Each structure stands twice: as C-alpha cells, then as structure tokens.
From Swiss-Prot:
GO terms for biological process: DNA recombination; DNA repair. It comes from Bacillus subtilis (strain 168). GO terms for molecular function: magnesium ion binding. It comes from the Bacteria. This is Uncharacterized protein YqaN. Residues 70-94 are annotated as: Disordered. Residues 81-94 have a biased composition (Basic and acidic residues). Transmembrane segments: none annotated.
Length: 142
C-alpha cells in the first residue's frame, strides 16, 4: 500500500467531551450527537478508500483541517487573501487534537485495527471558503 488519501467535505467537528448518565445503577458514556454524526460521516467517506485488508502495523497520519473563515477574515480583502495562502491561520479553539481525535476514532476497524497504531501524526489548521478535512495515511516500514 502506497498511501490512502481522502477528503471529508463540510465543516470539521471537534471531538466533544463524552456525556455520562446513570441507568440501572450503571454509568453509560456516549458521544455528543455532533461528534457522533461527524465520525459516521468520516467513516462513510473513508470506507470508499479502505484497503483490501485492514492495516495492522504502525501508520503515519497527516490531517489538514480547513475551518470556515470567520466574518472578521472574510470581510477583509487583505485578511482573506492571507488566509487563502495559509499565512493567516486559526489560533482559536477548538484545538487541533480535538479535531483529529474524531477522525482517528472513525477509522478504527476500517482503515487500521486501532488508532493506537498511529505512531506519527501531523495536524494543521487553516481557514478556507470550502471547509473540509484532508486525511493522508501511510504504513510505516520498520
């Protein structure tokens, strides 16, 4: 396998904190709805690029998160040009690790056996008129 690349179009969703409830004396944890649906969408897109056999060895991941431009950026021609060139980057919450958590979870048992196999990870945040998440996965050779 050379590499797996795919793009998830639409506004990226950061992994939210799990919600807990007690039923019949037991604690049940669940994903917030937005996170759950985003993971399902990522899995749907990734399933079109899945390898013939699930990857069982170490992998590297490169994730680029393109967030929608806020009005403060899109209303200013200079800021918009800088953002489109990648010179003006989002430094506000959510953090990059919260974006990638959902993506990694969505790929479990689909691309790789478990997200613990990710040994190299690069995540970048950008602004764009076309919000999306670009994912590239490579097997790491020993």
């Amino acid at each position: 396998m050379d590499c797996i690349k795919f793009t998830v179009y639409g506004e990226p969703v950061a992994q939210g904190r799990p919600r807990g409830s007690i039923r019949n004396g037991k604690v049940h944890m669940r994903d917030p709805a937005k996170s759950k649906y985003f993971k399902q969408y990522v899995a749907l897109v990734a399933s079109q690029h899945r390898p013939e056999t699930i990857i069982t060895g170490p992998v590297s991941m490169d994730v680029k998160v393109y967030r929608p431009m806020p009005k403060s950026v899109s209303n200013s021609k200079k800021k918009k040009e800088k953002a489109e060139k990648g010179l003006l980057r989002p430094t506000t919450k959510p953090d990059v690790d919260n974006y990638v958590k959902g993506v990694k979870d969505a790929l479990n048992h689909l691309i790789y056996k478990d997200d613990s196999q990710v040994v190299d990870l690069k995540v970048s945040k950008f602004y764009s008129e076309e919000p999306r998440v670009e994912v590239m996965i490579r097997e790491v050779s020993a």
